[in-house]
Amino acid sequence: MTKFVLLMTAVAATACTASTAAPNRSDDNRPLGTIRWNIDNLDRRDDGQVQLSFRTGEGSRNNSNWSSGYDLADLQGLSRSQLDGSNQPVRFALVREAGRLDCSGSAGNRQGVGTCGFTPDAGFAGRLTAAGIGRPTERQAYSLALAKVRYDLVEELGRHGYDKPTVSDLVGLGIHGATAGYVKEIADAGYRLGKVDGLVQFRIFGINGRFIGDMAAIGPQFRNLSADDLVQFKIFGVKPELVRAYTQMGYPAINPKDLVAMQIHGVSPEFVTELAALGYRNVPTQKLVELRIHGVTADFIRDLKQEGVALPSPDQLVRLRLAGYHPGKR
């Protein structure tokens, strides 16, 4: 069970992190080289956003790709009318705390292409150095800028007792949208995770203050849940409404580990309701899991009743399945 949960955690984390490819840490000291930008197939609906990609390197060597939605208002000098019109030269700048990208090229017919130069912000680098984090390389500063990392993130981490982050840690937090506001939200919900990796994991799985609060409101056993419990809830789809359903069905003391096991093995409120209708009320959660593991279904129980086997115990049902008994077959 534990190995399975750890494996699922790793698989889910890998899937969630694949959408943005940040530079490999071993490449941090290499020069950026040419930065290419690209806008392709801009949505006809004008929502003030544009999907913009930045790429460095040639082929697979020293290559990094960043693709994200940007507010057009943040791309100083680029307008929707330029993107919608006929092809024309354009210039724009993307300015962030860690540095600025000055870009040129051509745009029109809902697409665009060109190159950029990057200038690290010396003041931002100086603040990181003064905080004991270190001075970012040009490539790291570029990553910090595209990941929207602000210095208030460093301050908020310190305020809530996190280990001092590295520059790479800050990039990872930025990629996954862990802002200063998110750090505070999690802290206000009672979680100071200590390690930046734990905060990234929370963000990957969508754990926020509302989710924590909704769980805590269900009952005392869901207050002060461990960080691992919260992550496993997200991995296996244990939602507040699911837990409330079980508590209303006669399981007010249901615990986090039972919930995860039930989700893994396919126990559902519908399954519990079917069993109750057949005379099996308040079956212990571990027995519910055993029934599902061994393929005891409502149809199996109904078929037994038709053969005159009235209300065997959960243990007897499991033994019948283990013995290979099939109602209607001799």
Model-derived features: positions:
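Sec-dependent N-terminal signal peptides
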Residues: F4-A13
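General marker for long, soluble alpha-helical cores
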Residues: C16-R330
